[in-house]
Design a protein with these regions (language model features):
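Bacterial N-terminal signal peptides that target proteins for export
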Residues: 2-16
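Bacterial N-terminal signal peptides
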Residues: 13-25
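A structural "domain/chain start" motif
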Residues: 25-80, 85, 179-183
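C-terminal/domain-edge helix-coil "capping" segments
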Residues: 27-45, 131, 136-183
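A short, structured loop/turn motif at beta-sheet edges
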Residues: 43-47, 91-100, 127-138
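A short, hydrophobic beta-strand-centered structural micro-motif
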Residues: 50-54, 86-112
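Extracytoplasmic/secreted envelope proteins and their assembly/folding machinery
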Residues: 71, 75, 79, 85, ...
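A short beta-strand signature
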Residues: 119-129
Length: 183
């Protein structure tokens, strides 16, 4: 006959706690492009030129780490917003545009854990005339978004929603600001 030792219930409780922690924290998923495109973005005017977009400073998401905004995803979100708002006559995928919009993600602050997930992102937006090399507009932006505790069961899910929300806010503010410049 085999008897249960006192170590077995402790081991079971520890493994159960670990399993619940993994279930509730979830795996990190990157911010989705479509979720970073603002629904209500609009341009006050349309520029008759072409533009290409380049994003740097983003990071790929490690599934065991925290959600991030990748360069390609944010680049695509900004590009789709420019197309949707008809801010420029044409948005090019290569460096052949009349203007280049460079966006640098230079600071992202995320909470380590918690109920609500508030994310702050700082970016630098620069619009450059490709022919002359002249910087025609430059702006530093700081955006914040909070995903409430009821927006997703897992903290990782809330953090992904917060990353998407902050990306959307920054995208909308950036496009709204630079469309006002005189070209």
């Amino acid at each position: 006959m085999r008897f249960m030792t006192t170590a077995q219930p402790v081991r079971f409780a520890t493994l159960s706690l670990l399993a619940w922690t993994c279930l509730l924290s979830g795996c990190a998923t990157p911010a989705a492009t479509e979720a970073m495109i603002p629904e209500t973005a609009s341009a006050d005017k349309t520029h008759p030129y072409s533009v290409n977009v380049e994003v740097t400073g983003g990071r790929a998401t490690d599934p065991t780490g925290t959600p991030q905004i990748a360069n390609d995803a944010f680049d695509e979100a900004i590009t789709k917003t420019l197309i949707k708002t008809e801010t420029f006559a044409k948005v090019k995928r290569d460096k052949a545009g009349n203007y280049e919009l460079s966006v640098i993600i230079f600071n992202v602050q995320q909470p380590p854990y918690g109920g609500s997930a508030s994310v702050t992102m700082e970016t630098g937006w620069t619009l450059t005339n490709q022919l002359t090399g002249e910087i025609v507009w430059q702006q530093a932006l700081r955006s914040t978004y909070t995903a409430s505790s009821d927006s997703d069961v897992s903290f990782s899910g809330r953090l992904t929603k917060a990353m998407e929300g902050v990306g959307q806010n920054d995208n909308k503010e950036g496009v709204t600001e630079f469309v006002r410049c005189y070209l």
